[in-house]
Amino acid sequence: IGDATRNINGIFRLFPNHAKVVEHCEKIGFVSLPYILWKKPTTKPKYKGKGAFLGSGMLPPNAYVTLDCEFILIFRKGGPRRFTPKDPARYESRYTKQERDKWFTQIWDVIGTKQFLSEVERRAAAFPEEIPRRLMRMFSVVGDTVLDPFLGTGTTLKVAMELGRNMIGYEIDKEFKRIVERETHATK
């Protein structure tokens, strides 16, 4: 979830989308767990017509920090999940010590591959496959069901299929259907 900046009543300010989502999820019974910050390498500040650097350029005090991170919010419904000793799905889903040490840190610097997107695909909030792959391996086991309420181009669906997870996805924009079918067909 990316925060945003807005001009509200003539005053430039931060609109903390992540805080609003946390507040709402806690209100409906979810428990907040430590979040991850994904440092997006594609939103580096630039200047003089070469990008998105805004504010007063090189003059204080009206420049502002570029929002180049997104929050990966993690919630749980109820208490910790329990498994029987030696549960086969849990052992089949294990990760290595190196993966654990890399994944269970608060700041992720994940770089995606260059994408050549159609006009429809550019409207999606695209992210590298590595993001849902890590999250599914960290917080689910083989055979679990993953829910993506904003399916978009189907990245999460594709990764879930590759990892042996079941998947439910919702998307209100019908133009994405063809893209999702193409992505999932290539994965089968």
Spans of model-derived segments:
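Core catalytic lobe of class I
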Residues: I1-R178, H185
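C-terminal segments of enzyme domains that contribute to small-molecule binding surfaces
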Residues: K188
